[in-house]
Structure formats: C-alpha cells, structure tokens
Amino acid sequence: MQTTFVLVHSPSVGPSTWAPVAESLERRGHAAVVPDLTGVTVGGAPYWPRVVATVRAVTPATPVVLVVHSNAGFLLPVIKEGLGDQVVACVFADAALPPRNGLVTTAKEGFLPFLRDLAGPDGVLPRWTDWWDEEDVVAMLPDPAVRVRVAAEQPRLPLDYYTQPIPVPVGWDAVRCSFLWYSPPYDGVAEEAARRGWPVTRLPGLHLHQTVAPEAVTDAVLKLSRKS
C-alpha cells in the first residue's frame, strides 16, 4: 500500500507553505496531503482537538509519514495518536520538539511578553508575517508571488493559542522520528533531536525554506523517512 505524506503547517501560517513540497512529492509518484489548519481557532479553546480532527478528515487509510513545521511540532503527538497505527515515521522540519510526555504550550514563558505586546485589546494577534521587519520576511520569502500568497492566507490567531496546554501522549515517539534543520534559531532543537538518537539532516536556509528550495526539502524528507 502506498504511503501518504501528511505535511502539517504551523497554524501561524497556512497550507501554501507546504504546497511546493506536496507537488514535488506527487511528481515523484508519492501521495501527499496538506491539511488546512487556518480555521482551527474558530470557536474558542481548546484548539488542538480541531487540529487532530482536520488532519484525520483529509488523511486516507494508508500508512502515513507525518511531516511537521515550526510550532506544529508541539501538535504532532496528538495528531499521531489521532491517526493511530497508520503513522510509520515522523519528520520535524525546523519544528519544535515536544517532551516525551505530559503537557506543553506552543510559546515558552520568555516569549509571552513579546506576544502580549503584539496582541490587540481583543486578545488577537496580527498575522505572523506582520510580527517581523519587512526585510526579514523578504529574506524568508524572496519570491514576491509566494510572499503575497503566504501572507494572504494567514489567520490572526488568539493569544491563547500560544498558551493552551496540549497533551503529549506517552509513546508518541515509538516510531522512526527525525529532524530536518534549516535555520540558526533551531540549532538547539537539532542538538536535542540528536541527543534523542534521531537522524538529523542540515539543509541551510531560513525558516520557510520549504517554499524556497522544495526539491531539496523533498529529497531530505524522503531520505529521513526512508521512503526515497
């Protein structure tokens, strides 16, 4: 049975951040889906059950390689639990690593003052690309058309998306897990992945490198998941 690559974007951005890799996988004969998580905060907390339901709704009944980016890493354990034995491998692409078990929040305590300063009186944050200087966004998304597309689909998330406790089921990492490292802010995360005994591949770039070099990212995902 063919394996499906389920490419999970950070809820801070949108599905177009994985679309080029999905297209590359399909050109090579692999099945790929990109769940759209841009609506998961509609209706109030907790948000993670909607993430799980959204992923399950678009995932076929095949073996699955879960590929997560950025803060979607914290959601991987509950997504994996929702998909059950379908998941045969997990790839963290410049993504946060959850603990082995317990609870986790999307934002660390030290980052919350920055987020609180950004939030409006209604507790809603600007779009993620509006958090940063324009030159930094241009560096991450150098193609103007891609930059417009990514910016346009971003949701404005409530502050409590970043503070909600997300459960981390025991044994989520019993399958093959690996780390694809793009950017310098994730060097410590890559080191932690290596300490856990995971394969780590370095693909130098910025945080949205899958939109800039989708073929190279696809190569790395296939190798890390042993599907090349």
Residue ranges and their predicted role:
Residues 2-41, 62:
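Conserved HGGG/HGGXW glycine-rich cap/lid loop of the alpha/beta-hydrolase fold
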Residues 155-215, 219:
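Conserved serine/cysteine hydrolase catalytic core
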Residues 81, 85-87, 91-124, 161, ...:
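Flexible "cap/lid" loop of the alpha/beta hydrolase fold
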Residues 8-11, 69-70, 95, 182:
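Glycine-rich His-Gly loop
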Residues 67-76:
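Gly/Ala-rich beta-loop-alpha elbow adjacent to hydrolase catalytic centers
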Residues 125-171:
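Conserved alpha/beta-hydrolase catalytic His-Asp/Glu region
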Residues 66-67, 90, 179:
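Conserved alpha/beta-hydrolase fold motif
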Residues 34-65, 81-82, 105-113:
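Active-site loop/oxyanion-hole signature of alpha/beta-hydrolase fold enzymes
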